[in-house]
Amino acid sequence: HTEFKDSELGRIPKSWEISNIGKLTQFVTSGSRGWSQYYSSEGSLFIRIGNLTRDHINLKFADIQLVEPPSGGEGTRTKVKVGDILVSITADLGVIGVVNESLREAYVNQHVCLVRLESVSDVNPRWVGHFLSGHAGQEQFEKKNDGGAKAGLNLPTIRSIVVPLPSPQEQNKVVRVLDRLDSEISIKQTKLAKHQSLKKSLMQDLLTGKVRVTVN
């Protein structure tokens, strides 16, 4: 880009637009309280803050809770769909996840906000997710924390968050680059964890003499 303009987010390319989340969404909601009564050993995924991570914008399921959700409005309202953007709204604020095609039936709990965009052909959910997880998005969450000593974000606050909007084509290109980098980082982190585990095991054996080394 060669031409720039001033905006609420600072200097941005002249061709980009600015919008708050509320203008881009079908709805913004959060899970209901009291769903512990629906906990089950089988059923649907129940997405909690622990299923979100600051490492990337994909969900993580090392620790899962299953539910058998109630029929009717509450179950329908909090059921996630592909492309939904999830935001933690208590405790560790502004942790982001974007629901992808591989996710089974799932619902959000009361500590997670669900943002559903009006048109995913005009606005890529992963563009919004990457932006919200970056510095400019996180700075807005920090400024809008409405809980004082007790961290918290309400739904009107989420709707007020401002995002930049390049063309859909540019959004998609940026998303591909960032997703690829996240994938490469994840692969390397997995390899690193394996090497660290191997080193720990070898240290135990080598430093106690359980495994002998040949000295030339």
Residue ranges of each PLM-predicted region?
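Amphipathic alpha-helical coiled-coil/heptad-repeat segments
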Residues: 9, 164-216
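A short glycine-rich beta-alpha junction/loop motif
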Residues: 89, 105-113, 126, 146-169
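Non-catalytic DNA-recognition/assembly elements of restriction-modification systems
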Residues: 2-31, 160, 168-169
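Sequence-specific dsDNA recognition surfaces
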Residues: 4-7, 22-37, 50-82, 102
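Periplasmic-binding protein-like
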Residues: 137-141
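A short beta-sheet element
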Residues: 48-50, 65-133
